[in-house]
Amino acid sequence: MKRLLAALLALMTLLTMTSCAAPDAAETDDKLTLVAFNVGKADALLLTSGDTAYLIDTGTEDSWADLSRALEALGVTHLTGVIVTHMDKDHYGGAKQLAESDIAIDGWYASWAWEKEKWKKHPVVKAAAIRGEEITLLQPGGTLSDGLLTVIGPIQEREESENDNSLVLVASGGGGKMLLTGDMEYDEENDLLAAGVIPSCEVLKVGHHGRDDATSAALVAAVQPKVAVISTSSVILPESPAKRVLRVLSSAGAQIVQTQQAEIGVRVTLSGGNVTVEFLKN
């Protein structure tokens, strides 16, 4: 209960800041770029703005070789931070190998919604420890890199679904915003919709690989995305993306792109409020 109250207090602070803040990073002319890597039915996202670069989720252990080659192909030798949205293997699986790589990493981040009695087993804690480093837990209202990233969820910890403990982030820049959802399902969606913290965003990273237990019509109506990115593999997960999810996104006018459509991944760029999409090849 104390942890829930702390998260709600942080969220109230976020709402207050949002209502009276000065112009944010979304109103600058800096480009904001998201690369959603093709790592099968898993998540690995590279968010960049200027010299700042965050890797959000690390794919699976088995997909690390592909992710490593993709990062090398893009010239990534330094990360401002590694953020793991929640504790599913298709999101943290490559963390250990990343820690053992030559890529410089300034910080490690994870969701506050984690059982403290299992702290030593936290995969990101173990990965950071390889480098003798500690992790930072992110709570609603927290920001990184002068507002480039703002944490809006999770508001509460849910024992019945680790997916609904996913960090939900708003990335601001390039004259717009991107909503990055991890594996957020309906319960966490409803929490954030009820709290009124989901902004309209040009880009939506679709939750839970486009499966039918996420991405409600209400969420899509709130976000109003121009581009929706789905990280999935229909070979591994035939029911993804779900027809309903594709239908609700299409009805909202969103361009739908999937990581399985590209060799390396999909690059989405926000600049001057305009969105461009590129399918990256080896």
Language model regions located:
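Positively charged n-region of N-terminal signal peptides that target proteins for export
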Residues: 1-4, 8
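Non-globular, low-confidence helical/coil segments that flank catalytic cores
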Residues: 3, 17-282
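Bacterial N-terminal signal peptides
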Residues: 8-16
